Amino acid sequence: KIIKDMFVRRELIKISEETSDSAKQTELDQSGEDIIETSEKKLFSLAEKGSSRALIAFDDAMRQTIEMATNAFKNEGGIVGVPTGLRDLDDKLGGLHKSDLIIIAGRPSMGKTSLATNIAYNAAKHIQDTGKKSSILFFSLEMSSEQLSTRIISEQARISSNYIRKGQISEDQFDRFLETSKNLTELPLFIDETPAISIAAMGTRARRIKRLEGLDMIVVDYIQLMRGITNNKDGRVQEISQITQGLKAIAKELAIPVVALSQLSRQVEQRDDHKPLLSDLRESGSIEQDSDVVMFVYREGYYLGRKEPQQATVEHAEWQAKMNEVGHLAQILIQKQRHGPIGTVTLEFEEQFTKFKDTQLS
């Protein structure tokens, strides 16, 4: 114990000296914020497991495997990872597993942000219900924290967020809105709305939350709005590669799942079959390679709704019948799962509340 304490003290001195030297440099290769992020990462690593973190004996790795298998056995084949709150998706994935990078991708209006928000809320609610000291961290690069919280309240109160923003709700709905808001005040969900955040800054903030509050999962909306390494001059594809590698590194370092949203290329719209493929991921090489799970959100009803035939025709009657069949459904196409099967999960999507839920017949 004394030897370990002396080692920690020596490492602290070393980190302090390196930080001081970096701060004294007159060249501007690193900003003050970069120096803070680097130092905090070193301190976090030292506080967690010291410099031997990357070197693990097989016996220790095997103990972790036994612990994982024991938890799975006790759950009778149920959820071992962080629950998504969607039964069929959890059955397919077994929950969202620590150290995994999970990609949710889709074209605009498919509902990828809605799905990520639903999962974040469900995971945070699970933490709250179990009394665990932990949290969910949501990096919202596209929407403000107010817009994101409005969505969540809309989902739970079952009031259209569009009507909430316009003030077009009844007194009863407003009372329900306030009551729902009151019930969510203790939800262990943190929102970071920093635009164009760098992977280094994201890692720093995640470590801080994990140290202070505990952290079960990170959600990032979305990859293409992030920044890679400062002053990157190798092109956008290389920058996306740095970002996905960084997200995977954060997942491994903090031993949590990282859920990251991604755009798809426009070539999806140019095909007769609009179901996305792995090759449709924008700057796809590194996203596909670095991820553990890739799932696409696809709604046939969205495309069908844009092809409405002339009313009072046989074609319109057939179109309406098809819309009644699929208009409220969404498919989650799991096209990559490193440690499990691929496949499709069908969910219901309540567009007015931006809410996904299990189908009645599943």
Which role fits each region the language model picked out?
Residues 137, 215-260:
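Helical hairpin unit composed of two closely spaced alpha helices linked by a short loop
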Residues 86-95:
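Pre-Walker A adenine-sensing motif
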Residues 1-75, 79, 110, 133-134, ...:
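Short, small/acidic-rich helices and loops at N termini and domain boundaries
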Residues 106:
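The Walker A (P-loop) glycine that initiates the GxxxxGKT/S ATP-binding motif of P-loop NTPases
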Residues 113-121:
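Motif I (Walker A/P-loop) of helicase-class P-loop NTPases
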Residues 172, 202-215, 234, 245-254, ...:
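C-terminal regions of RecA-like/P-loop NTPase motor modules
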Residues 91, 122-214, 228, 345:
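Cytosolic-facing regulatory segments adjacent to core modules
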Residues 102-103, 137:
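Short hydrophobic/aromatic beta-strand immediately N-terminal to the Walker A/P-loop
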